[in-house]
C-alpha cells in the first residue's frame, strides 16, 4: 500500500501560478531593461533570459522548502511597499504574493553578529528550489538600512543584481537606485553599503556550471586580504 506522500503528484511550475508569474517578472527585467551599451552586460542578460526560457518551457518540479525568517525580514514589508512605488513595481507585487513561502538564509557557516541582524537572502529558482533548476539561480537579497556587507566574491559564478527598493553602493563606485543593474564577473571582490533611511531589496541572477551553483562556496574575504588588494 502506497503512503499518502507517494500518492501525491509532484507539483510542477505550471501548477504554481504565483511562482510562474514571479519568473515572468524576472524575464521582463532581463529582457526590457537597458544594457547601457555594455557588451558583457548584454551577453549576461541574454544568457539569463535564454536559460530561464528553457527552464520555464521544461515545466520543472516545484519543491516548497520550509519557510524561514531572519531578523532582517522584519524590513521586508517596508521594502515591498517602496518597490511598489518604484521602477520595478511588478516584481515587488509578485514577490509579495509568495512572501510567506520564502526561505531566508545567510549562506555562510559563520556570519558576523552585526551582519546577521541586517542581511539575508532567499533563492526562488536553483538547484535547491523551490523551483528546480541546475544552471541558473534566481533570488533576492535583503539589507536593513545602514548595512555594510563585507568584501566577498563568488568563484566561477557570474552574478547580476537589479535594485527593487532602496539605495545602495558597491565598492563606493556609484549609488544604485531601483531599476538599475550591476554585473559582477566571476571572482570579482565586492563590498556593499546601503542607505541609512530605507531597507534595500535586490533581485539577483547567478550563472555558472552546475557543479559550482550546487556548491557556491560563499565566503567572506579576510579584512587583511581586502586591505592588501586595495593597496592599504
Swiss-Prot record:
Pfam families (UniProt xref): DMSP_lyase (PF16867)
Record keywords, A-Z: Lyase, Metal-binding
Catalytic activity: S,S-dimethyl-beta-propiothetin = acrylate + dimethyl sulfide + H(+)
Residues that coordinate or bind a divalent metal cation: 154, 159, 161, 190
Root EC class: lyase
InterPro entries: DMSP_lyase (IPR031723), RmlC-like_jellyroll (IPR014710), RmlC_Cupin_sf (IPR011051)
UniProt-listed Enzyme Commission number(s): 4.4.1.3
CC cofactor: a divalent metal cation
Induction comment from the UniProt entry of this chain: Weakly induced by acrylate and dimethylsulfoniopropionate (DMSP). Part of the acuR-acuI-dddL operon.
Gene Ontology MF terms in the entry: dimethylpropiothetin dethiomethylase activity; metal ion binding
Task performed by this protein: May cleave dimethylsulfoniopropionate (DMSP), releasing dimethyl sulfide (DMS). DMS is the principal form by which sulfur is transported from oceans to the atmosphere. The real activity of the protein is however subject to debate and it is unclear whether it constitutes a real dimethylsulfoniopropionate lyase in vivo.
Assembly and oligomerization: Homodimer.
Further remark: DMSP is used as an intracellular osmolyte, predator deterrent and antioxidant.
Family, as annotated: Belongs to the non-heme iron-dependent dioxygenase family.
Stated name of the protein: Putative dimethylsulfoniopropionate lyase DddL
Organism of origin: Cereibacter sphaeroides (strain ATCC 17023 / DSM 158 / JCM 6121 / CCUG 31486 / LMG 2827 / NBRC 12203 / NCIMB 8253 / ATH 2.4.1.) (Rhodobacter sphaeroides)
